[in-house]
């Protein structure tokens, strides 16, 4: 089996060949993955914003952005620059410290969660044994920032939006965790790398989408609720509470909420692809393709091609899910707050618990198919 390309080892070895000491080469590697993570997440957000505008325009028989760059691809960049230079206003009776800290608490955990997202066999910043559990834990911090922002704004609409965000997150965090736990039970690990490897070897037939159809639906609904996407955008419903917790924000602080929302959407799509769609795995096993073509598994060129295809497959799967989320925005109407809570507590929670127990029973009965 091809173990993939070792980026860290190759980078350090290249610097050592240039004459740098081993310690210096390793020190230069340390900040590089985090820097690339931030750059990649930011570029991903710009692409998603442009795609959402174009897809939304097509759904409404409009053109969408077209003047800022070819096909309007620079429109998200222009919007970002506009937000950076806008005046940052803090309401007179707001709590300035909590008002400023709120957006940071919303964005920071989302960026940190990218540490455990693998794009290939060795293309991950840190392969933690509890990687997927870390993502669930970090996703629980963002609602605290939203509630803090709503409370600190000293605005009734902002406070109501923050309370809605907290209630929504608590309602859907548990079904989300149960659906992830079912995957971890089948994979015998909480590591994102191990979860993808458990789906390898049989191509598309080995993906968890076939073994966890109920968990897949629960995870997707809960992920949309966690990202506050329609039909679950009650914390910032314009027709009801102006802009929710964002009402009093402007400038870069408002931009942080904007960026955090889309970064979280891309992150949820990536995690979905890792858990249910085989992550970086190709629909046809590349090892078998290499064998049919007579290519050596240890060939350096095959390692480079495998790494490139792994990144491409992961990104394509994630953006396909983003495309579905954008279509849902213009297809499904917003639910009421009572419908939102009833769906989470009275339907998704018991169904996710039954799915978890059923997965445990199937693992004992059919250990080969369910990772026993």
UniProtKB/Swiss-Prot annotation:
GO annotation, biological process: aerobic respiration; photosynthesis, light reaction
Keyword Transcription regulation: no
Membrane disposition: Multi-pass membrane protein
DNA repair is among the record's keywords: no
Catalytic activity: a plastoquinone + NADH + (n+1) H(+)(in) = a plastoquinol + NAD(+) + n H(+)(out); a plastoquinone + NADPH + (n+1) H(+)(in) = a plastoquinol + NADP(+) + n H(+)(out)
Class of enzymatic activity (EC top level): translocase
Gene Ontology MF term list: NADH dehydrogenase activity; oxidoreductase activity, acting on NAD(P)H, quinone or similar compound as acceptor; quinone binding
Subcellular location: Cellular thylakoid membrane
EC number annotated for this UniProt entry: 7.1.1.-
Keyword annotations: Membrane, NAD, NADP, Plastoquinone, Quinone, Thylakoid, Translocase, Transmembrane, Transmembrane helix
Transmembrane region(s): 29-49, 97-117, 130-150, 176-196, 204-224, 254-274, 308-328, 347-367
GO cellular component labels: plasma membrane-derived thylakoid membrane
Disulfide pairings: none
UniProt superkingdom: Bacteria
Pfam families in the cross-refs: NADHdh
Function as written in the Swiss-Prot or TrEMBL entry: NDH-1 shuttles electrons from an unknown electron donor, via FMN and iron-sulfur (Fe-S) centers, to quinones in the respiratory and/or the photosynthetic chain. The immediate electron acceptor for the enzyme in this species is believed to be plastoquinone. Couples the redox reaction to proton translocation, and thus conserves the redox energy in a proton gradient.
Cross-referenced NCBIfam families: PRK06076.1-2, PRK06076.1-5
Stated family: Belongs to the complex I subunit 1 family.
Binding partners and assembly: NDH-1 is composed of at least 11 different subunits.
The protein, known as: NAD(P)H-quinone oxidoreductase subunit 1
Protein source organism: Rippkaea orientalis (strain PCC 8801 / RF-1) (Cyanothece sp. (strain PCC 8801))
């Amino acid at each position: 089996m091809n173990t993939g390309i070792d980026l860290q080892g190759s980078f350090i070895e290249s610097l050592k060949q240039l004459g740098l000491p081993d310690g210096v080469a390793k020190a230069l590697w340390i900040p590089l993955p985090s820097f690339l993570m931030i750059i990649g997440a930011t570029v991903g957000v710009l692409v998603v914003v442009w795609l959402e505008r174009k897809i939304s325009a097509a759904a409404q028989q409009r053109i969408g952005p077209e003047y800022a760059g070819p096909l309007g691809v620079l429109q998200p960049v222009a919007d970002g620059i506009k937000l950076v230079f806008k005046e940052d206003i803090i309401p007179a009776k707001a709590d300035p410290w909590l008002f400023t800290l709120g957006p940071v608490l919303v964005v920071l955990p989302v960026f940190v969660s990218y540490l455990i997202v693998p794009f290939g066999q060795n293309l991950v910043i840190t392969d933690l044994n509890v990687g997927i559990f870390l993502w669930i834990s970090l996703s629980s911090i963002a609602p605290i920032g939203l509630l803090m922002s709503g409370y600190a704004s000293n605005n009734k609409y902002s406070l109501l939006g923050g309370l809605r965000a907290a209630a929504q997150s608590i309602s859907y965090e548990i079904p989300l965790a149960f659906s992830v736990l079912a995957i971890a039970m089948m994979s015998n690990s909480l590591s994102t790398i191990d979860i993808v490897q458990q789906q390898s070897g049989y191509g598309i037939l080995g993906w968890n989408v076939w073994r966890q159809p109920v968990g897949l639906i629960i995870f997707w609904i809960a992920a949309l609720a966690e990202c506050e996407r329609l039909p679950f955008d009650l914390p910032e419903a314009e027709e009801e509470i102006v802009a929710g917790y964002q009402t009093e924000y402007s400038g870069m602080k408002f931009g942080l909420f904007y960026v955090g929302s889309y970064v979280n959407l891309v992150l949820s799509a990536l995690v979905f692809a890792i858990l249910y769609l085989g992550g970086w795995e190709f629909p046809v096993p590349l090892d078998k393709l290499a064998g049919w073509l007579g290519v050596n598994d240890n060939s350096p060129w095959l390692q480079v091609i495998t790494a490139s295809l792994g990144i491409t497959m992961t990104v394509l799967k994630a953006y396909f899910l983003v495309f579905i989320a954008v279509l849902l925005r213009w297809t499904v109407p917003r639910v009421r707050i009572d419908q939102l809570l009833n769906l989470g507590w009275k339907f998704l929670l018991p169904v996710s618990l039954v799915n978890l127990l059923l997965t445990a029973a199937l693992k004992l009965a059919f250990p080969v198919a369910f990772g026993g």
